[in-house]
């Protein structure tokens, strides 16, 4: 009977030791898993922030390109409208064609200057 008690006692100590080692192993594994999950979460967050920043920058660039195109189109339409209005005024006899010549180069110069200002503003990001 003592042999059985001693044998079971030794076995019990072995099981307790194994449980302690297993508990320690599980705890370490849980710690490492937590670290891994936190690392992935942090990197994912960084990548999301980077992606959002990239998308925002591209959107800003596209908006600048569109606004530049719109301003250019509006300037073209305005110039054509003035040109046609002048043609109508000349054709109807309200003004003489010679009276319109000096203002045309001046308007073109102003349009070119305005185009330059718009391009500079688009390059600076609208600031």
Swiss-Prot record:
<dbReference type="GO" id="GO:0005813">
    <property type="term" value="C:centrosome"/>
</dbReference>
<keyword id="KW-0963">Cytoplasm</keyword>
<comment type="subunit">
    <text>May be a centrosome-associated protein. Interacts with MYOC; affects its secretion and its aggregation.</text>
</comment>
<feature type="modified residue" description="Phosphoserine">
    <location>
        <position position="67"/>
    </location>
</feature>
<feature type="repeat" description="4">
    <location>
        <begin position="57"/>
        <end position="67"/>
    </location>
</feature>
<dbReference type="GO" id="GO:0048488">
    <property type="term" value="P:synaptic vesicle endocytosis"/>
</dbReference>
<comment type="similarity">
    <text>Belongs to the synuclein family.</text>
</comment>
<feature type="region of interest" description="Disordered">
    <location>
        <begin position="97"/>
        <end position="127"/>
    </location>
</feature>
<feature type="modified residue" description="Phosphoserine">
    <location>
        <position position="72"/>
    </location>
</feature>
<feature type="region of interest" description="4 X 11 AA tandem repeats of [EGSA]-K-T-K-[EQ]-[GQ]-V-X(4)">
    <location>
        <begin position="20"/>
        <end position="67"/>
    </location>
</feature>
<dbReference type="GO" id="GO:0007268">
    <property type="term" value="P:chemical synaptic transmission"/>
</dbReference>
<feature type="repeat" description="2">
    <location>
        <begin position="31"/>
        <end position="41"/>
    </location>
</feature>
<dbReference type="GO" id="GO:1903136">
    <property type="term" value="F:cuprous ion binding"/>
</dbReference>
<dbReference type="GO" id="GO:0005819">
    <property type="term" value="C:spindle"/>
</dbReference>
<dbReference type="InterPro" id="IPR001058">
    <property type="entry name" value="Synuclein"/>
</dbReference>
<dbReference type="GO" id="GO:0043025">
    <property type="term" value="C:neuronal cell body"/>
</dbReference>
<feature type="repeat" description="3; approximate">
    <location>
        <begin position="42"/>
        <end position="56"/>
    </location>
</feature>
<protein>
    <recommendedName>
        <fullName>Gamma-synuclein</fullName>
    </recommendedName>
</protein>
<keyword id="KW-0597">Phosphoprotein</keyword>
<dbReference type="InterPro" id="IPR002462">
    <property type="entry name" value="Synuclein_gamma"/>
</dbReference>
<comment type="function">
    <text>Plays a role in neurofilament network integrity. May be involved in modulating axonal architecture during development and in the adult. In vitro, increases the susceptibility of neurofilament-H to calcium-dependent proteases. May also function in modulating the keratin network in skin. Activates the MAPK and Elk-1 signal transduction pathway.</text>
</comment>
<dbReference type="Pfam" id="PF01387">
    <property type="entry name" value="Synuclein"/>
</dbReference>
<dbReference type="GO" id="GO:0050808">
    <property type="term" value="P:synapse organization"/>
</dbReference>
<keyword id="KW-0677">Repeat</keyword>
<keyword id="KW-0206">Cytoskeleton</keyword>
<dbReference type="GO" id="GO:0048471">
    <property type="term" value="C:perinuclear region of cytoplasm"/>
</dbReference>
<dbReference type="GO" id="GO:0043679">
    <property type="term" value="C:axon terminus"/>
</dbReference>
<feature type="repeat" description="1">
    <location>
        <begin position="20"/>
        <end position="30"/>
    </location>
</feature>
<feature type="modified residue" description="Phosphoserine; by BARK1, CaMK2 and CK2">
    <location>
        <position position="124"/>
    </location>
</feature>
